[in-house]
Each structure stands twice: as structure tokens, then as C-alpha cells.
């Protein structure tokens, strides 16, 4: 009975022994010279040495480094800053507030004589990355900033063993831009960004333009604006004692007018030509005034929409604004003419005096022929001649007329009604002549006005854009 009990005791002790000795074996196998992980541990020794060299390099470089002092050997030495600009996105152009928002990278490179070392003394390290807050950086800012943020982001710099420091911080700028909306929406804008040192003059820090063209390799297109050209130039501002260098980048941007053409210009032109159709409606239709009033209200709404887009300035009036004002005057005149034509249409001998001879001559004889209308006189001439011919025989029969007074009375009454009806028809025909005359007049004015306003601007816009694109392709 003892043997089986001893066996159960050994079996119960087995798991305990595994829990004690197995971790020890794993640790021994991992860290021992024969373990599987021994090679990995020995492989980490080399990066550790590199890290020690880099730590030693940082300590030697920045132990006595003062980042507020210009890194020059002599006080009169000048630091030359190679400056370049790369644009990643044209975020927005705010015409109302006259601002241009951009995302850019500021490329800056200079020599820091305090950050030089021999790579052989530090394990072959040729460059290090240092936070920009830990070393001297030029205080180059955007002068024409509009939101109070004059500097870029605080990012790391790349320092080479020969002292060359490269710093490319990203920045989001809102720069002031004078917007000229004269040819809106076929407008080109010239917005500039002026960079320079905030405190150093040219004898201490000189700015050198690295590349005349702005780097647009990583540019993300904007849906409303297109950059036609972006070039930089160097300038100097001189005062009584010193000179201050600066770099100015000029961005020539053009608006993509398709959206405004489809949803603003074409509806305005359509409303303008819709006004012409008012004169095609009969004068006895009351919808003529309603149509004119509806067009006028629609133009007012378009004018309010444009007022929200363009800046409030009395110096220039945008092209589309001129066209809307022209169309509103056009519609107002059409309302006045329509009211006059309706008044003419409803005239009669009982409400107005007899028609003047010159009115009858011009509007019943001459204008209908010029307007390719059938003459109103021709329609009633045969009836009048028949009436006159019928009066002759009746007048020659005096005896019969005396006997037939009642018939004569009826005849005179019928003739009077006929004359009254003819007078009414004459006035209605004059109203038709006026409608036809104003139809062609307003159509001609609308076509000439639309072409006169938009064609020269589009032609000029196309002639400016095409040579610039050809020049950019040649580059």
C-alpha cells in the first residue's frame, strides 16, 4: 500500500517542480551564451554604442550652447540664410475680408559654426536631428500676416557635421491680399507674401533666394482657384542706418469661372432675354406686368447673392454687378413701356380725344411696314369704301330717305358703332405696333449689352492665361 501512496505523492509534486525549474531554464536559455536569444542580445550592443556616441555628441555640442546668440565666429560676420518656399495647398481666398489662406513649407538653410564635429570621433555620425527650440534659428516671419501668427511651427532641424542646419517648418498663413473684383468672375488676382527677419538687419542676417519659383510638386488643387504663376524676388528696405533684406513671393491666381457661369451669369442672361418676351404677350393679358415684376425680383435676389461674395467697395463695380444693374434698368423700362402699351390698348373715343393725324400716319402706315406687320389700314379700307359707296345711292334718293327715317336712324346708329369700333381697333393696333417695336429694340439692346460686357473681358482673360500657361510648359 506504501508504493502506490508514494507514487501519488511524486505525481502531485511534478507540477510544482515544473513551475519552479521551467522559468529558470527559459531565463538561462535566453541570456546564456548558448541560448537562442544570445545572438540578439549581442546584436543590440552596436546600436547601444551608436546611441552613446550620439548622446556624447549632443552633450559636447549643447553643453555651452546659447541659442539666443548668433552662431558666428566674429561679431561682424554675417549669416546667410538660403530661403525657399513650397506650397502644399491654397486653402481659401476670402474676397469679402481680402485674405488668402495657404499651407506652406518654409525652406531655410544656414551655417552654424558652433555645431561642427568630426564624424570619426562620434562613430561616423554625420547628421543629427535637433528640436528648433534648442538652437539658434532666424526670426523670419511673414510681414503681411492677417491673423497674428507670424512664425511657422516648431519642428526639428537637420544638422550636418559641417554645421549646415536645414529647417523646413510647415505653416498655415492668412495673408492680406488686395482683391480686385472688376472682372468677377473672370478675374485674376495678384497676392504677395513678404518674408523677412523681424529684428536682424542685412549686416547680421542676409536672406538669399534659393529658387525663383515656388515649389509646387506637392500642391493640392483648389476647386475654385488655380495658381497661374508663383515667383519670388529679393528686395531691400533701407532706413537711416541699416538695410533690411526681404523675399517677396507673388502668386498670380485665376478664378475658375465655370460654377459662377452656370449658376449666376447664365440665369441672369436668361432673365434678361425673358424680359424681351414680355412684349410678345398680347396687351390684353394681365400677366405682362406680373412677368416683368417677377424678373425684377429675381434680379434683386441675384444682386443680394453677389453682394455677399464681393467686398464692399466703392472703388470698383464688378462686371456681373454692372450687368445686373443694366438688366434691372432694362426690366424697369420694360415695365414702364408695358404700362404705356396697356394704356394705349384700352383707349377708345369715349375716353380719349380723336387720334392725331401724325400718330395715325406713323403708327398705322409707316411703322407696320418697317416691322413686317400687316397694315391695319388695309384690313378696314375695303369696309370703309363699301360704306362710302353705299352712302351715294342713299343720298341721291331724298324722297325715299324722308319716308324711311327709321331706317336712316338705324343706319346712322350702326355706322356710329362701326366708327367707334374702328377707333378702338386702331388703338389696339397701335399697342401691337408698340409691342413689336419694343420687342426688337429690347432684343437688340439685350444682345449688344451682353456681348459688349462679357466678350471683351473673356477675350482679355483668355489672352492673359494662354501665354502664361505656354511659358510654364516651356519651363
UniProtKB/Swiss-Prot annotation:
Membrane topology according to the record: Multi-pass membrane protein
Activity regulation summary: Activated by a myriad of ligands such as acetylcholine, cytisine, nicotine, choline and epibatidine.
Cytoplasmic side: 345-437
Single GO BP term: response to nicotine
Reactions the enzyme catalyzes: Ca(2+)(in) = Ca(2+)(out); K(+)(in) = K(+)(out); Na(+)(in) = Na(+)(out)
Intervals, Extracellular compartment: 30-261, 459-475
Places the protein is found: Synaptic cell membrane; Cell membrane
Keywords: Cell membrane, Disulfide bond, Glycoprotein, Ion channel, Ion transport, Ligand-gated ion channel, Membrane, Receptor, Signal, Synapse, Transmembrane, Transmembrane helix, Transport
GO molecular function list: acetylcholine receptor activity; acetylcholine-gated monoatomic cation-selective channel activity
Glycosylation sites: 190, 236
SUPFAM superfamilies named in the record: Neurotransmitter-gated ion-channel transmembrane pore, Nicotinic receptor ligand binding domain-like
Pfam families xref list: Neur_chan_LBD, Neur_chan_memb
Broad class of the protein's primary localization: membrane
Family: Belongs to the ligand-gated ion channel (TC 1.A.9) family. Acetylcholine receptor (TC 1.A.9.1) subfamily. Alpha-5/CHRNA5 sub-subfamily.
Subunit comment: Neuronal AChR that forms heteropentamers composed of two different type of subunits: alpha and non-alpha (beta). CHRNA5/alpha-5 subunit is only able to form functional nAChRs when co-assembled with another alpha subunit, can be combined to CHRNA4/alpha-4 or CHRNA3/alpha-3 and CHRNB4/beta-4 or CHRNB2/beta-2 to give rise to functional receptors. Interacts with LYPD6.
PANTHER family according to UniProt: NEUROTRANSMITTER GATED ION CHANNEL (PTHR18945)
Role: Component of neuronal acetylcholine receptors (nAChRs) that function as pentameric, ligand-gated cation channels with high calcium permeability among other activities. nAChRs are excitatory neurotrasnmitter receptors formed by a collection of nAChR subunits known to mediate synaptic transmission in the nervous system and the neuromuscular junction. Each nAchR subunit confers differential attributes to channel properties, including activation, deactivation and desensitization kinetics, pH sensitivity, cation permeability, and binding to allosteric modulators.
UniProt-recorded name of the protein: Neuronal acetylcholine receptor subunit alpha-5
Protein's organism: Bos taurus
Amino acid at each position: 500500500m506504501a508504493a502506490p501512496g508514494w507514487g501519488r505523492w511524486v505525481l502531485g509534486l511534478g507540477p510544482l517542480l515544473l513551475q519552479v525549474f521551467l522559468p529558470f531554464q527559459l531565463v538561462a536559455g535566453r541570456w546564456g551564451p548558448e541560448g537562442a536569444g544570445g545572438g540578439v542580445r549581442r546584436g543590440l550592443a552596436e546600436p547601444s554604442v551608436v546611441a552613446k556616441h550620439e548622446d556624447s555628441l549632443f552633450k559636447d555640442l549643447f553643453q555651452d550652447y546659447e541659442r539666443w546668440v548668433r552662431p558666428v565666429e566674429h561679431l561682424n560676420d554675417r549669416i546667410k540664410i538660403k530661403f525657399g518656399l513650397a506650397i502644399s495647398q491654397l486653402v481659401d481666398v476670402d474676397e469679402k475680408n481680402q485674405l488668402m489662406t495657404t499651407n506652406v513649407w518654409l525652406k531655410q538653410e544656414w551655417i552654424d559654426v558652433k555645431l561642427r564635429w568630426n564624424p570619426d570621433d562620434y562613430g561616423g555620425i554625420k547628421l543629427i536631428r535637433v528640436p528648433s527650440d534648442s538652437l539658434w534659428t532666424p526670426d523670419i516671419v511673414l510681414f503681411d500676416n492677417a491673423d497674428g501668427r507670424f512664425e511657422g511651427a516648431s519642428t526639428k532641424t537637420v544638422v550636418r557635421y559641417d554645421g549646415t542646419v536645414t529647417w523646413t517648418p510647415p505653416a498655415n498663413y492668412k495673408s492680406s491680399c488686395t482683391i480686385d473684383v472688376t472682372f468677377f468672375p473672370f478675374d485674376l488676382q495678384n497676392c504677395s507674401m513678404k518674408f523677412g527677419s523681424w529684428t536682424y538687419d542685412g549686416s547680421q542676417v542676409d536672406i538669399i533666394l534659393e529658387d525663383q519659383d515656388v515649389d509646387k510638386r506637392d500642391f493640392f488643387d483648389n476647386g475654385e482657384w488655380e495658381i497661374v504663376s508663383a515667383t519670388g524676388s529679393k528686395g531691400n528696405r533701407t532706413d537711416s542706418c541699416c538695410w533690411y533684406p526681404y523675399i517677396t513671393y507673388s502668386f498670380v491666381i485665376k478664378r475658375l469661372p465655370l460654377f459662377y457661369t452656370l449658376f449666376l451669369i447664365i440665369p441672369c442672361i436668361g432673365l434678361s432675354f425673358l424680359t424681351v418676351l414680355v412684349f410678345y404677350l398680347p396687351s390684353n393679358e394681365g400677366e405682362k406686368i406680373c412677368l416683368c415684376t417677377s424678373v425684377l425680383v429675381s434680379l434683386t435676389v441675384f444682386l443680394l447673392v453677389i453682394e455677399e461674395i464681393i467686398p464692399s467697395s466703392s472703388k470698383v463695380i464688378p462686371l456681373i454687378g454692372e450687368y445686373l444693374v443694366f438688366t434691372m434698368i432694362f426690366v424697369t423700362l420694360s415695365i414702364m413701356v408695358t404700362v404705356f402699351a396697356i394704356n394705349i390698348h384700352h383707349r377708345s373715343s369715349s375716353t380719349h380725344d380723336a387720334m392725331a393725324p401724325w400718330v395715325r400716319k406713323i403708327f398705322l402706315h409707316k411703322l407696320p411696314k418697317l416691322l413686317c406687320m400687316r397694315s391695319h389700314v388695309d384690313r378696314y379700307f375695303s369696309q370703309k369704301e363699301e360704306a362710302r359707296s353705299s352712302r351715294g345711292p342713299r343720298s341721291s334718293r331724298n324722297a325715299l330717305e324722308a319716308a324711311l327715317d327709321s331706317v336712316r336712324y338705324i343706319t346712322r346708329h350702326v355706322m356710329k358703332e362701326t366708327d367707334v369700333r374702328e377707333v378702338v381697333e386702331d388703338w389696339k393696333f397701335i399697342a401691337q405696333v408698340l409691342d413689336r417695336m419694343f420687342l426688337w429694340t429690347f432684343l437688340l439692346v439685350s444682345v449688344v449689352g451682353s456681348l459688349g460686357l462679357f466678350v471683351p473681358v473673356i477675350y482679355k482673360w483668355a489672352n492673359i492665361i494662354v501665354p502664361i500657361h505656354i511659358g510654364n510648359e516651356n519651363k
